[in-house]
Structure formats: structure tokens, C-alpha cells
């Protein structure tokens, strides 16, 4: 017999019918293989049930504090990234950083001082670290808070 798509069949014994339990005294009737009485005979044990000991979700400590709804999360851009994206220098604003894909739109931007900057740039952002401001001004640029 050749191996063709219309000749494919499962191997003998590979597919067995589902055993229907609790349907008469023939096979797996009455108690359906669950034994007699007890929680396991009646329905099912809850997934997180630990046999009566204190469950893990109650043993673990509660989290302290609260989530501050007014917390401002800044997107950060380092000086080496600005140097890489704007090698000719010039004015760099939040819109320019969004256009180049350095940050996402709609979130405040903070410029951090990792790396070096070799060109004079006029950077306007929502916040600057002290190191970033020093390095930008040392390279002949300016910083403006938006």
C-alpha cells in the first residue's frame, strides 16, 4: 500500500473511545472509580486547596504602602543617544526625539548624562540631570525646560 494522503489512518490502538463513567454497573458504574465518601468522591478538590493547612496566598506577607496616582514617569534619553541621533547639532526638542524614535509621544522626557556630547545642541525637555546640563553647556549648547 502506497503512502498517500487518502490512505493515512491512525495506528491500531492509537485512538481509544472515552470511558463514560457512572453509567450503570457494567464498567466504572456507581462510584465511577472514586471510592466511597469524602471530598474527592463528591465533586473535586479546589485547585489551591492544601489539605487544611494555611494556604500560601495567606501565609505570604501583604504588600506595604500604596500606588501614588500622581507619580510622574519620565522617559529617559542619554547624551550619547542625542549625539548619535543629531551628529550635526542644532535644536533638539521632544518632537524631534519622538520623530527619531528615541522616545514615545505623550510622556515627559528627562535627559541624563551618560556618555559624551561633542556638538553644540539646544535641547528642550521636561527635565535634565545636573550632569547632563553641565556636559551640554560645556559643549557649547543650551538647556531649556519645557
UniProtKB/Swiss-Prot annotation:
Pfam families the UniProt entry points to: Ribosomal_L27A
Record Gene3D superfamilies: 3.100.10.10
Listed GO biological process terms: translation
Extent of the signal sequence: none
GO cellular component, one term: cytosolic large ribosomal subunit
Phosphoprotein listed as a keyword: no
Region described as Disordered: 1-39
GO molecular function: rRNA binding; structural constituent of ribosome
Domain of life, source organism: Bacteria
4Fe-4S keyword on record: no
InterPro entries for the chain: Ribosomal_uL15, Ribosomal_uL15/eL18, Ribosomal_uL15/eL18_sf, Ribosomal_uL15_bac-type, Ribosomal_uL15_CS
Keyword line: Ribonucleoprotein, Ribosomal protein, RNA-binding, rRNA-binding
HAMAP family referenced in this protein's UniProt entry, alphabetically: Ribosomal_uL15
Cited function: Binds to the 23S rRNA.
Quaternary organization: Part of the 50S ribosomal subunit.
Family that this chain belongs to: Belongs to the universal ribosomal protein uL15 family.
The protein's name: Large ribosomal subunit protein uL15
Organism encoding this protein: Nocardioides sp. (strain ATCC BAA-499 / JS614)
GN (gene name): rplO
